[in-house]
Amino acid sequence: MTSNAPITPPIFDGHNDILSLLYDAGLSMAAPVDIDRFVTGMAGHLDAEKMRKGGFAGGFFAIWVPSPIDMDIKTTQMNLPVYDLPLPPEIALDKAVPVALAQAAILHRMEQAGYLKICTSTAMLQSCLDNGEIAAIMHIEGAEPIDRDFYNLDMFRRAGLRSIGPVWSRPNNFGHGVPFRYPSSGDIGPGLTDDGKRLVTYCDENGILIDLSHLNEAGFWDVAKLSQKPLVATHSNAYEISPHSRNLTDR
């Protein structure tokens, strides 16, 4: 008997925070990171079972260095009909690197446990899609762990990095993030710094995607002028639908 049930196409997700959630859970319990929570169950939108039920085929797994602010307060404020949150302060390189390395190691441990496959080429990605393996693209959200000479970037690339967002919603050596503000235009402040422009060129030359999410409008156009690769915003939305400072206008 033929089923009339709709077939769910495989979903490739633009962004998830599994790595930072696993890292933060280890800190809160003052214990080693338990990657098996990915299988046994995690709070939030994603874990192995939720992925299976939802047809999740793969996505961008973000390495993100949190700001030392009260995220609960921020989340509460962002539920208001109007809000304007100041940009968090910059995070120093020596503070960012250990956190980023730990989250990259978590992703590798998940691969070693057989939970997913870190993909560094389109051929690897297609193989995962064909064989039902979860495909993971290692992504850095906010380039705080990257030094001006890009030595760290070279090492992260060796570890599997294939995507980077120059900024999160805070300033760093490479650019100026857009604040969490609603309603608001994204045309807020300067774009990429000179180092940020060098970063775009270096990533273009080394097969690392530049993610436009969290850049302000000036930063978006800086990347558009410099990069010879397709423009990608992994987790931004349409400004005409929701006039948030992070969303993209029709222009």
Question: Each PLM stretch: what is its role?
Answer:
Residues 1-186, 243-251:
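N-terminal hydrophobic targeting/anchoring segments and the immediately downstream early-domain regions
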Residues 166-176, 181-251:
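Active-site core of metal-dependent hydrolases
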